[in-house]
């Protein structure tokens, strides 16, 4: 695709608006959807709206962060610090994000009970299955195993660099959860735990004991399968979790 400053310079079949009308919004990439919001690119760097949108997502994902998580909590000041994003583009992006939040909040609330590895895998499938990069996520639960929040903590290449107990339990405490399930994916599809997976689980079980917040399981998701470390290992016998 030619990243010139004007959408008009892109072939009609590749323009985001035209593609949305032709094939539907759900088939557009994240960059294409943002490009529709901001309308124009950055002429100083010869970027089309799509090119600038890709740059915004790349900037938000620095440090192995989830770009959507960053956008959900971003401010006008943070957005305008990105080259090519002025107040108008920042306002357009933030308006789109806020509208999405309000639509989501208007949905009838459905309580999701996560009381088995299978239920946890279903809750995590959209975030972790069929991903090209390794992702680490946490399910925040209440005392009755009702799902409070699903958070992708980090995105990276190796389990040992993906997650730190501090980051994981910060999410749990922030959401007022009383128990958690952690999970990450193996892009290869092999759901057998690596030595690093076992070491990380051991550290997190120890942290959970200290904090009094039980870690219920650690799942590894593949392409269309998953494995439960609680079922496969004796770690939970070695580090009994608080009730």
Curated annotation (Swiss-Prot):
<dbReference type="InterPro" id="IPR046778">
    <property type="entry name" value="UPF0758_N"/>
</dbReference>
<dbReference type="GO" id="GO:0006508">
    <property type="term" value="P:proteolysis"/>
</dbReference>
<feature type="binding site">
    <location>
        <position position="186"/>
    </location>
    <ligand>
        <name>Zn(2+)</name>
    </ligand>
</feature>
<dbReference type="Pfam" id="PF04002">
    <property type="entry name" value="RadC"/>
</dbReference>
<dbReference type="GO" id="GO:0008237">
    <property type="term" value="F:metallopeptidase activity"/>
</dbReference>
<dbReference type="GO" id="GO:0046872">
    <property type="term" value="F:metal ion binding"/>
</dbReference>
<keyword id="KW-0862">Zinc</keyword>
<keyword id="KW-0378">Hydrolase</keyword>
<keyword id="KW-0645">Protease</keyword>
<keyword id="KW-0482">Metalloprotease</keyword>
<feature type="domain" description="MPN">
    <location>
        <begin position="112"/>
        <end position="235"/>
    </location>
</feature>
<comment type="similarity">
    <text>Belongs to the UPF0758 family.</text>
</comment>
<dbReference type="InterPro" id="IPR020891">
    <property type="entry name" value="UPF0758_CS"/>
</dbReference>
<feature type="short sequence motif" description="JAMM motif">
    <location>
        <begin position="184"/>
        <end position="197"/>
    </location>
</feature>
<protein>
    <recommendedName>
        <fullName>UPF0758 protein SYNPCC7002_A0220</fullName>
    </recommendedName>
</protein>
<keyword id="KW-0479">Metal-binding</keyword>
<feature type="binding site">
    <location>
        <position position="197"/>
    </location>
    <ligand>
        <name>Zn(2+)</name>
    </ligand>
</feature>
<feature type="binding site">
    <location>
        <position position="184"/>
    </location>
    <ligand>
        <name>Zn(2+)</name>
    </ligand>
</feature>
<dbReference type="InterPro" id="IPR001405">
    <property type="entry name" value="UPF0758"/>
</dbReference>
<dbReference type="Pfam" id="PF20582">
    <property type="entry name" value="UPF0758_N"/>
</dbReference>
<dbReference type="InterPro" id="IPR037518">
    <property type="entry name" value="MPN"/>
</dbReference>
<dbReference type="InterPro" id="IPR025657">
    <property type="entry name" value="RadC_JAB"/>
</dbReference>
